[in-house]
């Protein structure tokens, strides 16, 4: 269905602007990706509001997705399965952060976990990113360097948000500091894991199991 809609939009735009087949394919791919992104965001938002985990689930989703744009990583063979997994994982992480275990966790421990994850994140990104796939090969060294640099910049922005959250917590007792920090921490950890061999094996296993169910 999504593929048909994106194809119709691409054909309409290409016809109006007299684009060749190459440009039409680019428009179709971009439209397809945009629709899937919107489906993910809207689905996570609705389910998050229903279960009162919207903040945590959405921050996790955006954290992992934005970093993924630059760092690459293991993908599901089916883009539809990939979208579904993203929604499910985001909701599960939202529930996890809202659980009594993390709700009762000492703030200093959250800070410590954050330090560990960011050290791990910088190491993994510096060593492995960007990770391409058969469907999305990175063909030039220049692009690889640009994507690695982008990944490190995104990580640094996340680190800045973490530090700012800590400052706000200690200065004004900001009540959302812990869930915001944990959501970013989980997002960074998950995305960086997909850059590793273990993450690749894990996603392939989940992908195989999901395809059997569908």
From Swiss-Prot:
Top-rank taxon: Bacteria
InterPro entries, alphabetized: AgrB
EC number: 3.4.-.-
Primary location class: membrane
UniProt subcellular location: Cell membrane
Membrane topology field: Multi-pass membrane protein
UniProt KW keywords: Cell membrane, Hydrolase, Membrane, Protease, Quorum sensing, Transmembrane, Transmembrane helix
Disulfide bonds: none
GO biological process, one term: proteolysis
GO molecular function: peptidase activity
GO cellular component: plasma membrane
Pfam family, one: AgrB
Ranges that cross the membrane: 41-61, 83-103, 109-129, 154-174, 179-199
Family per record: Belongs to the AgrB family.
Function: May be involved in the proteolytic processing of a quorum sensing system signal molecule precursor.
Protein name: Putative AgrB-like protein 2
Organism: Clostridium perfringens (strain 13 / Type A)
């Amino acid at each position: 269905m999504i593929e048909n809609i994106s194809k119709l939009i691409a054909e309409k735009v290409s016809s109006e602007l007299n684009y060749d087949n190459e440009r039409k394919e680019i428009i179709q791919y971009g439209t397809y990706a945009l629709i899937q992104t919107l489906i993910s965001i809207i689905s996570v938002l609705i389910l998050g509001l229903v279960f009162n985990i919207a903040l945590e689930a959405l921050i996790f989703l955006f954290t992992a997705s934005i970093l993924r744009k630059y760092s690459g990583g293991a993908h599901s063979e089916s883009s539809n399965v990939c979208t579904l997994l993203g929604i499910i994982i985001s909701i599960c992480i939202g529930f996890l952060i809202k659980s009594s275990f993390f709700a009762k966790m000492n703030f200093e421990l959250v800070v410590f976990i954050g330090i560990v994850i960011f050290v791990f994140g910088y190491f993994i990104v510096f060593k492995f990113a960007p990770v391409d796939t058969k469907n999305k090969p990175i063909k030039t060294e220049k692009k690889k360097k640009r994507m690695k640099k982008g990944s490190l910049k995104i990580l640094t922005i996340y680190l800045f948000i973490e530090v700012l959250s800590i400052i706000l917590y200690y200065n004004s007792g900001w009540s959302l500091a812990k869930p915001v920090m944990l959501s970013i921490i989980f997002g960074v950890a998950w995305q960086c894991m997909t850059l590793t061999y273990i993450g690749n094996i894990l996603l392939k296993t989940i992908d195989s199991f999901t395809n059997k169910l569908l």
